[in-house]
Amino acid sequence: DLYRSIAAKEKEFTLDPRQSFNLRQEGMQFYHRYLSLHQLKDYQGVIRDTRHNLDILNVIANYAGTVENITSQQHRPYVMMMNTSAKTMLKLEDNDKLEALRILKAGVRQIKHVYKNVLEDPQPDLSPEIFQLRELQHRITDDGVPTELPVLEKLEIELQMALLSENY
């Protein structure tokens, strides 16, 4: 919010690398929290924190240099996936499978758009985020309300996300 308010006042506002780094560090703190909240099934908290991280990514996209922007935007699909997953799970808690599926499909479309138009990836369907949302969709349509992922799958996802976020 601070940087947005400054940007609103200053026409030529840009984030320097240090400010971008500080925003990314803040995003990492929120990342760790929303991962924990997801495990605790606090989906409202996940939605709140992922929105915050998407806001951070928007500020970086609008006001940071190219290197900082590229470094940060690679995380956008994952944050969007977590946001979509939490919204979906809330609808499933309300037994609203149709709305849950609508949210999932919209999330997949939005993530594909980011992969194609922001990250310039010609094959977004191969991304781990799309895979996870499709897996959730499959579990909803075939098996009812999804169950917990098997431990091996969770570990594989965590490894992929750690590699993407360079957090190993």
Residue locations for each model-derived region?
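Short amphipathic alpha-helical segments, especially helix-boundary/capping motifs
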Residues: 7-11, 60-65, 131-136
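Amphipathic alpha-helical repeat scaffolds of TPR domains
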Residues: 22-36, 51-54, 58, 74-93, ...
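Charged, alpha-helical scaffolding/interaction elements associated with membrane systems
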Residues: 40, 94, 161-165
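Ampipathic, surface-exposed secondary-structure segments
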Residues: 108-149
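C-terminal accessory/binding modules appended to enzymatic or scaffolding proteins
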Residues: 141-167
